[in-house]
Amino acid sequence: GWPAYPGSNGIRSSVCQKKLGCGSKNLASLGVCKAFCLGRKRFWQKCGKNGSSGKGSRICNPVLAHAVEKAGKGLIKVTDMAVAAIVKYAGKK
């Protein structure tokens, strides 16, 4: 089924960023984090509570909705790992 709607406040980019701790551990992850939160906000604005407001839109499907919500949790970890790898690689030159 469709994941729980985060609410009009919950979809806000600033709330999303705070929840994910954007840039708190690694400032380099801030840009990726901000972009994700903005995309997530647009997704929810377009698709509404159960995908009904985005009639006929292919992005408004439950699989993607769950992926969007799950992505937030894994995003920071992945970004931090990527940044660490880039820093390590850059230091080798």
From Swiss-Prot:
GO molecular function, one term: toxin activity
This protein's record includes keyword Secreted: yes
Location in or out of the cell: Secreted
GO biological process: killing of cells of another organism
One term under GO cellular component: extracellular region
Domain of life: Eukaryota
Disulfide bonds: 16-37, 22-33, 47-60
Main location: secreted
Tissue: Localized within the skin and proboscis and are most readily isolated from body mucus secretions.
Keyword check for Oxidoreductase: no
Keywords carried by this UniProt record: Cytolysis, Disulfide bond, Hemolysis, Secreted, Toxin
Family: Belongs to the worm cytolysin family.
Chain's role: Cytolysin that shows hemolytic activity (on bovine erythrocytes, HC(50)=5.75 mg/ml). This hemolytic activity is completely inhibited by small unilamelar vesicles composed of PC/PG, PC/PI and PC/PS in 1:1 molar ratios (with at least 100 mg/ml concentration).
Protein's recorded name: Parbolysin P5
Organism: Parborlasia corrugatus (Antarctic nemertean worm)
